[in-house]
Amino acid sequence: MVKIAVCGAAGRMGGRIIAAVKEAEGVEICGALERPGHPMVGQDAGYNAGLGAIGVAISDDLNAVVQACDVLIDFTAPKVSLKNLEVCALYGKSIVIGSTGFTPEERALAAELARDIPVIIAPNMSVGVNVCFKVLADVAKILGEDFDVEIVESHHRLKKDSPSGTAVRMGEVVAGALGRDYNKVANYHREGICGERTHDEIGMQTVRGGDIVGEHTVYFIGMGERIEITHRAHTRDMFSRGSVRAAKWVVTAKQGVYDMQDVLGLR
């Protein structure tokens, strides 16, 4: 039985992850974390998950929770995730990170901290999105240089980072398949008289509003035709179920940084 702890247990994703752990086989919820001072600290973690009492109180003691678990699932923010990763490394515990918005420097630090433990860092835990990553690479290689690439992503009005980590990863996948450096060809802003579109650029547009769970479309636009590859998330449950699947996988992995492509055997 894999013992799972959840960080951000009082949040939307935290609640869905706890529910996913309770419905999955071979795993159990052994800990729930929140920041010190959060009003739900001390309350049963099952209530936020819509389960009623499950006998696991929300704690603000990171060290104690990590020591008691086999793997920590973290959907918070980069700085919090890095702190959690540091503590997991201290105690030799695995961690699954679904936080987005990491800078290149933060990614490098995460890789350094993962030298002694297995770590999964994935901007999207959905099986469907990760299949899209595979498809996008294949399509980009087939179409080559004859099609322009644009990405549009839409999320709820409360999302804090832009563009989404999933959209950035899609851009990285396409750029890599085309032999381009994503950081050099990504275009996040067009306004006014900005000139013609350059051949290599990958445009990135964001939409924020309402309660959109998540929608990503990659356009391959040629002369006289275009291909659109879209993924739409209807609920957060596929993220939470994917994170539990990742947690079950990572506890048997060797030290290092992995993503959902590794979990799903898509490499």
UniProtKB/Swiss-Prot annotation:
It comes from the Bacteria. Pfam families: DapB_C, DapB_N. It is found in: Cytoplasm. Transmembrane segments: none annotated. It catalyses: (S)-2,3,4,5-tetrahydrodipicolinate + NAD(+) + H2O = (2S,4S)-4-hydroxy-2,3,4,5-tetrahydrodipicolinate + NADH + H(+); (S)-2,3,4,5-tetrahydrodipicolinate + NADP(+) + H2O = (2S,4S)-4-hydroxy-2,3,4,5-tetrahydrodipicolinate + NADPH + H(+). GO terms for biological process: diaminopimelate biosynthetic process; lysine biosynthetic process via diaminopimelate. Signal peptide: none annotated. (S)-2,3,4,5-tetrahydrodipicolinate binds at residues 156, 165-166. SUPFAM superfamilies: Glyceraldehyde-3-phosphate dehydrogenase-like, C-terminal domain, NAD(P)-binding Rossmann-fold domains. GO terms for molecular function: 4-hydroxy-tetrahydrodipicolinate reductase; NAD binding; NADP binding; oxidoreductase activity, acting on CH or CH2 groups, NAD or NADP as acceptor. NAD(+) binds at residues 8-13, 34, 98-100, 122-125. NADP(+) binds at residue 35. Its EC number is 1.17.1.8. Belongs to the DapB family. This is 4-hydroxy-tetrahydrodipicolinate reductase.
